[in-house]
């Protein structure tokens, strides 16, 4: 009896579960860790980079992409299965088409919430249709609207979405989120560089080998998505390490 609810997408179990949706959410928890932070004049996206094959071109393995000139997205997928990475590609392509269609019809760009709601609605439809399965992705969607205010939304495989000041998704989301809850303050995002460093610090809580395993991007108002090179990320990591050393020295002096 239990296996029937386990396999059916559109049938609730007696205790109110949609197991296929819950399995998709578990798949997301095994994906790369991604973090998004709203600054005053900037939004930062950071993603844990998984190691690639020796002969593979790492430029083709991206977790951050632009949906429109003012909206971008990072996603967490179970990268060991290419099918779920392909899920992200389908959602990205649908969202990009919707951005362009909206611009042609209304003659205005989409708002960040509009495209987030579109993606969430698409995901939700795949939780109540026979012959389909839920998308195995969770996404952080960021950008700026005409009012100049930065936005950050998160969606999950069930089709729900929420606005955040800072959030994390993926395998170590809980650890990163706890770090952000302790360290996200107005001072921590007062400048662009401080917001960038906060995102890197959050990822360094769970990422091994420092900056070389971090993919970082920022978006500013009226500016396109900017991807950081590995060298740029390493410079920030070096600066963070120096700040830690100086803080430890000050503590040791006080204790003496």
From Swiss-Prot:
Subcellular localization: Nucleus
PROSITE patterns noted in UniProt: PROTEASOME_ALPHA_1, PROTEASOME_ALPHA_2
Cellular component GO terms held in the UniProt record: cytoplasm; extracellular exosome; nucleus; proteasome core complex, alpha-subunit complex; spermatoproteasome complex
InterPro entries: Ntn_hydrolases_N, Proteasome_alpha, Proteasome_alpha-type, Proteasome_asu_N, Proteasome_sua/b
GO biological process per UniProt: cell differentiation; meiotic cell cycle; proteasomal protein catabolic process; proteasome-mediated ubiquitin-dependent protein catabolic process; regulation of meiosis I; spermatogenesis
Statement: the UniProt record of this protein carries the keyword RNA-binding: no
Major subcellular location class: nucleus
Pfam family, one: Proteasome_A_N
SUPFAM superfamilies the UniProt entry points to: N-terminal nucleophile aminohydrolases (Ntn hydrolases)
Top-level taxon in the UniProt lineage: Eukaryota
Keywords, alphabetical: Differentiation, Nucleus, Proteasome, Spermatogenesis
Function statement: Component of the spermatoproteasome, a proteasome specifically found in testis that promotes acetylation-dependent degradation of histones, thereby participating actively to the exchange of histones during spermatogenesis. The proteasome is a protein complex that degrades unneeded or damaged proteins by proteolysis, a chemical reaction that breaks peptide bonds. Required for 20S core proteasome assembly, essential for the degradation of meiotic proteins RAD51 and RPA1 at late prophase I and the progression of meiosis I during spermatogenesis.
Quaternary context: Component of the outer alpha-ring of the 20S proteasome core which is composed of 28 subunits that are arranged in four stacked rings, resulting in a barrel-shaped structure. The catalytic chamber with the active sites is on the inside of the barrel. Interacts with canonical subunits of the spermatoproteasome, including proteasome activators PSME4 (also called PA200) and PSME3 (also called PA28-gamma). Interacts with proteasome-interacting proteins chaperones, ubiquitin ligases and ubiquitin specific proteases.
Family named by the database record: Belongs to the peptidase T1A family.
Protein name: Proteasome subunit alpha-type 8
Organism: Homo sapiens (Human)
């Amino acid at each position: 009896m239990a296996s029937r609810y386990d396999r059916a997408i559109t049938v609730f179990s007696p205790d109110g579960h949609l197991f296929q949706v819950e399995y998709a959410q578990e798949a997301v928890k095994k994906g790369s860790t991604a973090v998004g932070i709203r600054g005053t004049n900037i939004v930062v996206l950071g993603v844990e980079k998984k190691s690639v094959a020796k002969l593979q071109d790492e430029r083709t393995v991206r977790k951050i992409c632009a949906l429109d000139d003012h909206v971008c997205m990072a996603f967490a997928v179970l990268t060991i299965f290419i099918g779920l990475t392909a899920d992200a590609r389908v959602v990205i392509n649908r969202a990009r088409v919707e951005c362009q269609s909206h611009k042609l019809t209304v003659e205005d760009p989409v708002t960040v919430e509009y495209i987030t709601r579109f993606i969430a609605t698409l995901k939700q439809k795949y939780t109540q249709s026979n012959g389909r399965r839920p998308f195995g992705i969770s996404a952080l969607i960021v950008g700026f609207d005409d009012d100049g205010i930065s936005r950050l939304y998160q969606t999950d495989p069930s089709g729900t979405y929420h606005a955040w000041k800072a959030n994390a998704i993926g395998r170590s989301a809980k650890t990163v989120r706890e770090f952000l809850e302790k360290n996200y303050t107005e001072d921590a995002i007062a400048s662009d560089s401080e917001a960038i460093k906060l995102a890197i610090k959050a990822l360094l809580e769970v990422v091994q080998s420092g900056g070389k395993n971090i993919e970082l991007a920022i978006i500013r108002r009226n500016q396109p998505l900017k991807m950081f090179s590995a060298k740029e990320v390493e410079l920030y990591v070096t600066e963070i390490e120096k700040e830690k050393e100086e803080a430890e020295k000050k503590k040791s002096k006080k204790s003496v």
